[in-house]
């Protein structure tokens, strides 16, 4: 089920405050966040946000095509460990 149209998109308050401060000063710096559920809004365009994937923070540059998506969509949490080269049983 999607979010109601009557409600505004969710953006964590601490993230919104940091972005608005940077926009007022017209500065660009990496913003570190754990808030993967925050929606990307137009005021974030042009900023680099380091999103936590459970292990580390991945820096993501926000473009206009990302507006409306969640931050967590751009920081994958799972990585595939390759099978051993000489392990024939697992490659069947």
UniProtKB/Swiss-Prot annotation:
SUPFAM superfamilies: Ribosomal protein S19. Keywords: Chloroplast, Plastid, Ribonucleoprotein, Ribosomal protein, RNA-binding, rRNA-binding. Its main location: plastid. GO terms for cellular component: chloroplast; mitochondrial small ribosomal subunit. PROSITE patterns: RIBOSOMAL_S19. One of its GO terms (biological process) is ribosomal small subunit assembly. Protein S19 forms a complex with S13 that binds strongly to the 16S ribosomal RNA. GO terms for molecular function: rRNA binding; structural constituent of ribosome. Belongs to the universal ribosomal protein uS19 family. It comes from the Eukaryota. It comes from Lemna minor. The keyword Ribonucleoprotein applies. Pfam families: Ribosomal_S19. The gene is rps19. It is found in: Plastid, Chloroplast. This is Small ribosomal subunit protein uS19c. Gene3D superfamilies: 30s Ribosomal Protein S19, Chain A (3.30.860.10).
